[in-house]
Amino acid sequence: MNQAVIVAAKRTAFGKYGGTLKHLEPEQLLKPLFQHFKEKYPEVISKIDDVVLGNVVGNGGNIARKALLEAGLKDSIPGVTIDRQCGSGLESVQYACRMIQAGAGKVYIAGGVESTSRAPWKIKRPHSVYETALPEFYERASFAPEMSDPSMIQGAENVAKMYGVSRELQDEFAYRSHQLTAENVKNGNISQEILPITVKGELFNTDESLKSHIPKDNFGRFKPVIKGGTVTAANSCMKNDGAVLLLIMEKDMAYELGFDHGLLFKDGVTVGVDSNLPGIGPVPAISNLLKRNQLTIENIEVIEINEAFSAQVVACQQALNISNTQLNIWGGALASGHPYGASGAQLVTRLFYMFDKESMIASMGIGGGLGNAALFTRF
């Protein structure tokens, strides 16, 4: 079987919903990343077999194809857009790696993009052309049958209740995320991931959701979103805009083209869970991944689990017995933000830049009761 390696990875800084990036459509968010790869790796770009991108709330069509054309890549390069909800970016990376393993191609660009600010509104189609009632807007997408389709906040509350994750534990984890993120921004670790871009004449190179300092006591001052609950705005992620691209190729070709370090894709798993508990998906996904590769949690140096809500990450940490020295060691989405279809690719990008780590897992909890996870080693 061929081996797939990730040899380059970059992302935009993530903008807040309605923030600096609010005027940019998904293909415009991707354009500077494509152009960066085109300028830095011209010989490789000419060999691309496909572009695979995750996207969740875009305006339809095939964003991967449209974006590569907008960026001036060759007409002969195809593109495919994947929607596995919040797991889309990680799914796209796995898809590209699997295609290489199968011998279907040798060079891929994978990643994800999201503009929550530009997400279109959707209305229900009338049953008859003669209806006079005002159009009814969809509040959100439906992930499962009505009786098992909680909002993401309710899903986080369900996980917190089922797994005994207290408000205090959730706030403590959120504080940790902000502290670790701030520390790794300051020491330059996170800046390695980011390609600075110019927006309306201004340089944009820092995640817009970041808070320079939040006193620990502040987390306890927020009221629960749902009365009687434990999930608050402070222990939940923000909605964000941003894009991520990774260059993935067959290992022998990577060496031939002068690449000598990066991530080696070992395996990936996607599972289903109770759709009322969407955030718990990483538990069986990671468990299955470890079992299939005859590993234990102790064999993994770093585990990145997307921080949609403190409740679900803490529940996963406890269920899998992950230590604090393994979990989200540079912080996470509670501080940096969550651009849905790009977040899984961002986790892999983060692992790419942890040059001193040898064994790593990225995992996402996904709306509708899903979880995915991917295993990487250094090459």
UniProtKB/Swiss-Prot annotation:
Transmembrane segments: none
A Pfam cross-reference name: Thiolase_C
Entries under CDD domains matching the protein: thiolase
Residues at the catalytic site: C86, H338
Keyword DNA damage belongs to the record: no
Gene Ontology molecular function, alphabetical: acetyl-CoA C-acyltransferase activity
SUPFAM superfamilies per record: Thiolase-like
EC number: 2.3.1.-
Keyword check for Acyltransferase: yes
Any one cellular-component term (Gene Ontology): cytoplasm
Keywords: Acyltransferase, Transferase
Annotated InterPro entries: Thiolase (IPR002155), Thiolase-like (IPR016039), Thiolase-like_sf_Thiolase (IPR050215), Thiolase_C (IPR020617), Thiolase_CS (IPR020613), Thiolase_N (IPR020616)
Biological process terms in GO annotation: fatty acid beta-oxidation; phenylacetate catabolic process
UniProt enzyme class: transferase
Family of this protein: Belongs to the thiolase-like superfamily. Thiolase family.
PANTHER family: 3-KETOACYL-COA THIOLASE, PEROXISOMAL, ACETYL-COA C-ACETYLTRANSFERASE YHFS-RELATED
The protein's name: Putative acetyl-CoA C-acetyltransferase VraB
Name of the gene encoding the protein in the UniProt record: vraB
